[in-house]
Amino acid sequence: MQWNMAQSLWKVLSKQPGDPTKVHSKRNGKIIQSQVICGTGSNARHVQFKFFLNNRLTNCTDRSWEGPFEFFPWVHEYVADARPTLLLAHMGAHVHSIAAYEEAMASFMRSVALRNSSSLDRVIFRTATPGQASCDDHSRPFPRPIDFELREGGLSNISFHWDLHPLFNSIAAREIARAARGRIRDRIALLDVYQMTSMRPDGRRGGGDCLHFLLPGVPDWWTHKLLVQLRHWAARLVRRPS
């Protein structure tokens, strides 16, 4: 997932103020590890929180680069850890063709399949989000979805391949649905935040970055949607007969 969503999720889980990069127990480039406590009293559980930067979710075994993109190994650690795990993944902005995205998505799904998943494991794949040309000119959300649609063309979409993001998301939805019909079944879900994010030309970093958002802001709403999905899964586990 994007770093700003990782920050948002960490702050919701940990309930600690400040920048998570300054309080995490271990930091190695873009590998962040920390522990958060979920629940209270006798129900409290220590949960390990990890963030890996891997722009295309590759199954590399060593840290590597391709131009400006960084790839930190994550697959071995994910597969080897026997504890119940929630994997939250995202890919899109650093892939620039349909063929490359299909290949990367297929590789990611193979990596997920390597894990001997328990009934408590969960996988959530978050969709790519829309960029907004001339974001510095916006200070409030669009009032109607069509306002984004009328403005989504232009040089920024073409030069950064933002026009491919809806196609990437269709591929992701197809692969997640296929996996849900297989061995992993109902333990995988798509977190679709494209449409809701298209309403927000504002709140972005700006100054040349019209894709990423400031915090607090839009990524916090992605986190809220994630928590709704987790509550849905939790409710199903509670209702499941023993």
Residue ranges and their predicted role:
Residues 1-242:
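Extracellular glycan-modifying ectodomains
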